[in-house]
Amino acid sequence: MSSHAEPTPVARNRKPLTLPALRAMQQRGEKIAMLTAYESTLARVADEAGVDTILVGDSLGMVVQGHASTLPVTLDEMAYHTRCVARGLQGGAAWLVADLPFASYHQGPSQAMAAAATLMQAGAQMIKLEGGGWTAETVRFLVERGVPVCAHLGLTPQSVHALGGYRIQGRDEAGAAELRRQATELTQAGAAMMVLELMPSAVAAAVQADNPQLMTIGIGAGPATAGQVLVVHDMLGLTRGKLPRFVRNFMHSEAGQNLSVEDAIRAYVAAVKDASFPDPVAHAYASAS
């Protein structure tokens, strides 16, 4: 059985986004809407719905492959899904970011460069890597060689066992200070963008204030970041089980109507842009008192 839909790229109404264009969005106070995608059709829908940045996340290990964590995902699998998404974005506008999976960059800059090259040759325009100060040398090495880098602090799922599970990071004073220190170190190393995951809103706000040139993208980090990201399966209500409090199901409108996938993604983009999502109470976390 096959689809008979026309596979060729269609014209979009937006100009392709670049790193300078994303920076300009931040400078004029426009929020950046990021969303995950793992295959071409949904990537195209997300692009047409106005998503600014598509993330081919190693979260595919959980929501696509059915694993309990992101750890089993391989570089070859990330490259495959990146190629799929890149084909869906042909003729589109969204900026494409791809995750370096576990153990593909941990041995140092040279290994990271080889892995980054694989993903960029597959169509990525920026690579994302998890980790604190120990990744600064690698970030600098990649940026000096023309690879745009998105860092990732807070809850880093590839370190789930070391962290003792999916727990909020930086809730106490010492933890918050360490996250701020690491964020500044990675920014100085050249990271242009940074995902801040599962941390108190005040900590994420401080990271952004410390590094005004950094494009912070929050997920469970409150409303003060330069943008937001969600896993597409979560915001479409496809994920089963208990979801984190920062997730909102956009398949249902505020008026109680059921939306199409494209309209749900449009609603997500609009909510990010007008700062109605995330809610500073319902979708956020506070520091320990």
Swiss-Prot record:
Alphabetized CDD domains for the sequence: KPHMT-like
Pfam families in alphabetical order: Pantoate_transf (PF02548)
Catalytic residues in the record: E197 (proton acceptor)
GO cellular component, one term: cytoplasm
Reaction catalysis annotation: 3-methyl-2-oxobutanoate + (6R)-5,10-methylene-5,6,7,8-tetrahydrofolate + H2O = 2-dehydropantoate + (6S)-5,6,7,8-tetrahydrofolate
Transmembrane segments: none
Binding site for 3-methyl-2-oxobutanoate: D58, S59, D99, K128
GO biological process: pantothenate biosynthetic process
Record text on cofactor binding: Binds 1 Mg(2+) ion per subunit.
One function term, GO molecular function aspect: magnesium ion binding
Pathway in which the depicted protein is active: Cofactor biosynthesis; (R)-pantothenate biosynthesis; (R)-pantoate from 3-methyl-2-oxobutanoate: step 1/2
Keyword Cytoplasm assigned: yes
Named cofactor requirement(s): Mg(2+)
Superkingdom of the source species: Bacteria
Family annotation (InterPro entries): Pantoate_hydroxy_MeTrfase, Pyrv/PenolPyrv_kinase-like_dom, Pyrv_kinase-like_dom_sf
Parts forming coiled coils: none
Binding site for Mg(2+): D58, D99, E130
Keywords: Cytoplasm, Magnesium, Metal-binding, Pantothenate biosynthesis, Transferase
Subcellular location: Cytoplasm
Subunit structure, interactors included: Homodecamer; pentamer of dimers.
Entry function: Catalyzes the reversible reaction in which hydroxymethyl group from 5,10-methylenetetrahydrofolate is transferred onto alpha-ketoisovalerate to form ketopantoate.
Family: Belongs to the PanB family.
Protein's name in the database: 3-methyl-2-oxobutanoate hydroxymethyltransferase
Species this protein is from: Leptothrix cholodnii (strain ATCC 51168 / LMG 8142 / SP-6) (Leptothrix discophora (strain SP-6))
